[in-house]
Design a protein with these regions (language model features):
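Mid-domain alpha/beta scaffold segments of enzyme catalytic cores
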Residues: 1-208
Length: 208
């Protein structure tokens, strides 16, 4: 038993409309659209459906002025093509689990209200992020992620990832940028509060 993807999108759209009726301070209010995006890593069998669904969700982000949480794997050109059509209207968001190179980072950062989400991969011995990020990405364009339960950072690699492991990512990036853990935490917390405006109301408690 399944649902046609168009029907699923229609139900999700209805949910967004209904959510707007909640008080602004309600803990049930949505804070973002996503995780959504494109993933052609395994197959392009449903490429058309993915493209249409992603663009529809980008439109929701614009309509409801909610940031996007974007997943993109082996689909960068297609994703950028869609986003460019709405570039001036996009409220911002996060390119989730970024593991790309300097050129890819620069392509993503053209969307000036977005940040790159950096997770456990940055701690892997084989990762180039420790060199590429300081060379091409300003600190105010980074947020920290775990991608729990996946991608556990060193020294927990191979285990189930936990939110508590975010400190390993923070320490790795602080060393890469040549700043203290405290400075990295402060900047990335500020970035989260900027990208997700709902957190600005809780700024004093916006700590890792």
């Amino acid at each position: 038993v399944g649902e046609n993807w168009r029907d699923v999108l229609a139900m999700m759209k209805q949910s967004f409309d209904e959510n707007l009726l909640l008080p602004e301070n309600s803990p049930l209010r949505y804070i973002a659209v996503g995780e959504c995006g494109l993933d052609f890593y395994w197959s392009r069998e449903f490429e058309r459906e993915q493209l249409l669904a992603f663009e529809e969700q980008v439109k929701w982000s614009v309509e409801y002025k909610l940031p996007l949480m974007i997943h993109c794997r082996k689909a960068q050109n297609e994703m950028l093509h869609i986003l460019k059509a709405y570039e001036k209207e996009l409220p911002g968001g996060v390119f989730h689990c970024f593991t790309g190179n300097q050129k890819e980072a620069e392509a993503f950062l053209r969307f000036d209200k977005f940040c790159l989400g950096i997770g456990g991969v940055s701690t892997f011995k084989s990762s180039h992020l420790r060199e590429d990020l300081p060379a091409s990405v300003p600190l105010n364009r980074i947020v920290l992620e775990t991608d729990s339960p996946y991608m556990a950072p060193v020294p927990y690699r191979g285990q189930r990832n936990e939110s508590a492991f975010i400190g390993q990512v923070l320490h790795t990036l602080a060393e890469s940028y040549g700043i203290s853990n405290e400075e990295m935490a402060e900047v990335t917390n500020e970035n989260v509060c900027r990208v997700f405006p709902v957190y600005a109301h809780f700024k004093a408690n916006c700590k890792l």
